[in-house]
């Protein structure tokens, strides 16, 4: 799940939910088109607990705070409550967290999952390219997931939800979370609130101009004014990703 905490307050978990009239999807998003995010996966342990991104036929990228030693990866998933024949379920053979992951600060919140067999790629299951450069502030990106659709209360969707949101500047990000943003994090969303990723979206993709630039990591609450979502900055990890994949 997305960490809805200010992770450096002496280890105390705090979240400040608010009401919002526009809470309908992700929070404030919409139901994705069926093949809008063929790279989106659902991480399962008897239930959906996090998202992830298929970056090769046998590797998935997600958040380290989603770690479990054994994971069932569902690909081609769209409606969690129904099957349309496009789904593939493949168990993990390896789950590799970044060695520098810090559970308190959520720095280096990244992990790789090796599938026990290669996925069959098609229009519903496909890979997303890694970034060739870091994304610039102001770029609109696509966020997707099956996380909570309410900033106050809980309403989890069956159908994959999408949200278009802008990348914020590093100064906007640091101002929202003073002293807590590292160079491995980016903020994406709306400072006025109302639209955001939420619990259950963790590890799920942020795709900008066709490249995987981030995935859901943490924040204070969901869709709260002044507190945009914080995402792992994938462009900083391309070398780590490629090295880890080639050596495993």
UniProtKB/Swiss-Prot annotation:
Keyword check for Protease, yes or no.
yes
* Cofactors (names): Ca(2+)
**Disulfide-bond pairs as recorded:** 32-162, 50-66, 134-235, 141-208, 173-187, 198-222
| Protein's cellular compartments | Secreted, Extracellular space
PROSITE patterns named in the record: TRYPSIN_DOM, TRYPSIN_HIS, TRYPSIN_SER
Q: Which SUPFAM superfamilies match?
A: Trypsin-like serine proteases (SSF50494)
Which class of enzymes does this protein belong to?
hydrolase
Per the record, the similarity remark reads: Belongs to the peptidase S1 family.
Q: Which protein, by its recorded name, is this?
A: Trypsin I-P38
Q: Taxonomy-wise, where does this protein's organism fall, top ranks first?
A: Eukaryota, Metazoa, Chordata, Craniata, Vertebrata
